[in-house]
């Protein structure tokens, strides 16, 4: 991925995680962690974070991952990078729009956050490299 795409991806992930720190009613484990590290003041903007910022930042992370596909052409990396934001979006929308049980929505959201975090660490440790050219992959010459 290009440096800009990687930075945008990290901004989306950090924004989603920090946004989850603000909602004690929705995501008690994340809010407890946020309060423990001094981010308890975010709870006064709980509605803004849950309704707008978490979905926006998760969408930014998803779009950055999908944009990275055009740089590295690795479907496995793109799939793994997309799972976390999609789970986070399903969890937060399931909770705010009441189409999922609260506990199930929380589990899905937390799973999405963990996947986003782990894939982000993996991306920093092992950055993506282009495997194919934009016009297609070269096939190796046949062995004789």
Swiss-Prot record:
Effect of residue 72 to E: Slight decrease in activity
Topology, Periplasmic side: 43-46, 100-103
Recorded topology in the membrane: Multi-pass membrane protein
InterPro entries xrefs: Mercury-R_MerC
Transmembrane portions of the chain: 22-42, 47-67, 79-99, 104-124
Localization, UniProt: Cell inner membrane
Any matching Pfam family: MerC
GO annotation, cellular component aspect: plasma membrane
Entry keywords, A to Z: Cell inner membrane, Cell membrane, Membrane, Mercuric resistance, Mercury, Metal-binding, Transmembrane, Transmembrane helix, Transport
Induction (UniProt): Constitutively expressed.
Positions annotated to bind Hg(2+): 23, 26
Gene Ontology terms, MF aspect: mercury ion transmembrane transporter activity; metal ion binding
Segments on the Cytoplasmic side according to the record's topology features: 1-21, 68-78, 125-144
Activity: how regulated: Inhibited by the thiol-modifying reagent N-ethylmaleimide (NEM).
Subunit composition and interactions: Monomer.
Function: Involved in mercuric ion uptake.
Name of the protein in question: Mercuric transport protein MerC
